[in-house]
Amino acid sequence: MAVALILLLIAIGSVLFHLFSPWWWTPIATNWGYIDDTINITFWITGFVFTAVILFMAYCVFRFHHKEGRQAAYNPENKKLEWWLSVGTGVGVAAMLAPGLVVWHQFVTVPADATEVEIMGQQWQWSFRLPGKDGRLGTSDVRNISPENPMGLNRDDPHGQDDVVIENGDLHLPIGKPVKVLLRSVDVLHDFYVPEFRAKMDMVPGMVTYFWIRPIRTGTFDVLCAELCGAAHYQMRAKVIVEAESDYHAWLEQQKTFAGLSGRNAVVRAKYNSGDD
């Protein structure tokens, strides 16, 4: 009886904790509310199954507890029950998988009018590259990476000369405009993650991965690295500032281009803070 009561309390407590938990999503700041919807669908389906299984276990513990003289019935198979379980499991998996596939298709289908922005991760800083007045990014190659050219831009590509390069600073984006985020890594796995954006993707050395977003709320948002990348992983912080388009262009006008930076002799790098400073 006590075991049945404990199981019942676990089921009720788990559901109540989920419904009234103080730890919930941050307010969304992009178009990816669909991702929240798919997570909610998964929570409801798995929560229903969890509750049903726990309540069934509690019922069995109470209904079929040990009694003197009672003998358990031996039933090696039950085809009817097996069919019901198979169909129910299939429906549940399909109900979770189908919305995810629909959202994934939207996630990787970038609008034709999206502006490309490149983000590079390295131990332990973020670098950003935005298109200049020509509206397109120049080509790049990892073989071009050097202290004077940390993002590996092709110096002979005219489209890259007006690219805006920001090292270890903040990224600005205009509100309401689709942005294709190109992701690269210099050294190890990183993951550019802004909780309010919902969208994220691993950054893999030697590959260019991507996702796209449309910011729907102005504000300043924290950037985190969601992939353990070394001793100073915690230092991979930055800000994304979503602002009105006029403010964005005013900020962009104040930034230095690759052509203006390529002649310098030194580049400021992120340093590991040992705690002795």
From Swiss-Prot:
It catalyses: 4 Fe(II)-[cytochrome c] + O2 + 8 H(+)(in) = 4 Fe(III)-[cytochrome c] + 2 H2O + 4 H(+)(out). The chain crosses the membrane at residues 41-61, 84-104. Residues 62-83 are cytoplasmic. It is an enzyme of class 7 (translocase). One of its GO terms (biological process) is ATP synthesis coupled electron transport. GO terms for molecular function: copper ion binding; cytochrome-c oxidase activity. Its main location: membrane. Belongs to the cytochrome c oxidase subunit 2 family. Cytochrome c oxidase is the component of the respiratory chain that catalyzes the reduction of oxygen to water. Subunits 1-3 form the functional core of the enzyme complex. Subunit 2 transfers the electrons from cytochrome c via its binuclear copper A center to the bimetallic center of the catalytic subunit 1. This is Alternative cytochrome c oxidase subunit 2. It comes from Bradyrhizobium diazoefficiens (strain JCM 10833 / BCRC 13528 / IAM 13628 / NBRC 14792 / USDA 110).
